[in-house]
Amino acid sequence: MGKEKAHVNVVVIGHVDSGKSTTTGHLIYKCGGIDKRTIEKFEKEAAELGKGSFKYAWVLDKLKAERERGITIDIALWKSETPKYMVTVIDAPGHRDFIKNMITGTSQADCAILIIAGGTGEFEAGISKDGQTREHALLAFTLGVRQLIVAVNKMDTTNWSEARFNEIVKETSNFIKKVGYNPKTVAFVPISGWHGDNMLEPSTNMPWYKGWSKEVKGSSSPATGKTLVDAIDAIEPPVRPSDKPLRLPLQDVYKIGGIGTVPVGRVETGIIKPGMVVSFAPSNVTTEVKSVEMHHEQLAEGLPGDNVGFNVKNVSVKDIRRGDVASDSKNDPAKEAASFNAQVIVLNHPGQIGAGYAPVLDCHTAHIACKFSELIEKIDRRTGKTMEAAPKFVKSGDAAIVKLVPSKPMCVESYNEYPPLGRFAVRDMRQTVAVGVIKSVEKTEGKGGKVTKSAEKAAKKK
């Protein structure tokens, strides 16, 4: 086996018709996410349905349909392998809750792949003012996804035109610069997700294309390559935050006969291990971790990115709930937030938002109404400079620093300290109306806490 490859998470963004499903499907199909048996089954069905040409997008549709029917698809289907990395495609595009998922995200993306349709008229529609592409790119940037790859798709429909590719690179560079990316650090790859050109192998249809090159932090020589897979391999590896204090937002709490209470969630930062005394915020319960397991196997420790279940003693299912955050009681334990200040970007709200507005916030696994108690300042989205102090209201397209007060106990953190607990989506009218990044949190001890016997014993042992 050798050493396991490093993992990277990519999110694929772009306009509905950019061909991102086909491209993602092709990547997963060719790079090993889907086992041969499943492919044969799909191909047979495709042939029977007269989709004999077998569209890669159809693979993705099948996976998505199964996922939406609530059949949990083995997440490996969304994985593919490149020479250097194990790649997980975080959320297949076109998914209804795409924006919410990106924020409360099952995991933070290390890189975004922006798929642009090269066809005449298509490109222009994709990045027009109200375009989805713009919203997705803005979202990725706001949420701290700093690495970007641009794939110019459907080159086959442009007769593999170099002039068209160059025109799109120029326009897209301006476009992503406005969002906040530096085009010099971005690989631009002309592809056909349908025919496979420049996906894994250099295309013979575009002899004019000499490859991409991008600046790399801390290196005087640029990174270069030919294909989309090369570009994925040139992603700078992420640093996983295992040296930070523990933060583990609960997704569920189970009661398991003969074992007891088992909270389940993803380790976002730090490490959880048996014997540790954890406290849950904002529930204010402290207890000892008896065991940690993942996929029904006991673990010596759970690391960032691991989805774990852990058994806690003397805590009932009524004491803790989804949205609570587990942390190490001896190392910067998590606390309830009395209020917090955040930079909010309004994406699509039909009216104007003023003080008193109280939508639902989705932050990590918490889903709680919060009141905009004060609009502190309106700022320039790109530079962060103040444009107006104490504005009366903000509207779509605006960025502002606001003070938020949760309607029920809630635990959040500043984005700088604990990124996964410091970004949120503002939901109203069944859509995401704004996204935010938390600047600072005013913490409170909350109501009287419960410390279990086992926690006291464990503390004495230490």
From Swiss-Prot:
N6-methyllysine PTM sites in chain numbering: 3, 30, 318, 392
N6,N6,N6-trimethyllysine carried by residues: 79
Modified residues (N6,N6-dimethyllysine): 3, 318
Residue numbers binding GTP: 14-21, 91-95, 153-156
Chief site of localization: cytoplasm
All residue ranges annotated as the tr-type G domain in the record: 5-242
Region called G2, residue ranges: 70-74
Purpose: This protein promotes the GTP-dependent binding of aminoacyl-tRNA to the A-site of ribosomes during protein biosynthesis.
NCBIfam families (alphabetical): EF-1_alpha (TIGR00483), PRK12317.1 (NF008969)
Entry protein name: Elongation factor 1-alpha
Species per Swiss-Prot/TrEMBL record: Serendipita indica (Root endophyte fungus)
Gene name, Swiss-Prot/TrEMBL: TEF1
